[in-house]
Amino acid sequence: MSELPRMSFGHLGIDVIDIDQMVDFYTNVLGFKLTDRGLGGKAELAFLSRNPEEHHQIVMAATRKDNERTTINQISFRVNDFQEVRQAYDHAVAAGIEGIEPVDHGSALSVYFPDPEGNRIEVYM
């Protein structure tokens, strides 16, 4: 078997139920910018990024049905220090998010909270 080339993570795709609600959350709570929006086949798509050099880090597709569970365990965002974890916590509280959970893992400090469709978000250092 040949060796794999060096790879880096490119982007995450999420099947969503309510694309407007999810775009609102990811832009207003997590600081993403909506970079593009349109149709891909029969699905409405939204592209979001926090990196001005990347067209998208997340693509959302309005393809999930109301009765389908999310299959994402968690989406994790690394920050530089405890102050930035605390800022994320305070921002989530101010946004009225329920189910916020700060956790000391010993090797990392994290805050967890759900997005509007139940995907678990982690901000950690």
Q: Residue locations for each model-derived region?
A:
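Short, flexible turn/loop "capping" segments at secondary-structure junctions
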Residues: S2-R6, D66-T70
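Short, charged/polar surface micro-motifs in flexible loops or helix N-caps
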Residues: E53-H55, D66-E68, F82-V85
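Short beta-strand micro-motifs in enzyme catalytic cores
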Residues: E44-A46, N73, L109-V111
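Vicinal oxygen chelate
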Residues: M7, I17-D20, S76-R120, M125
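Core segments of cupin and vicinal oxygen chelate
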Residues: E3, I14-H55
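Hydrophobic adenine-recognition pocket in adenosine-nucleotide-binding enzymes
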Residues: L12, I75
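Short, charged/polar, Gly/Pro-enriched secondary-structure boundary elements
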Residues: E53-I58, G118-E122
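A short beta-turn/loop motif at secondary-structure boundaries
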Residues: G38-G41, D66-N67, V103-G106
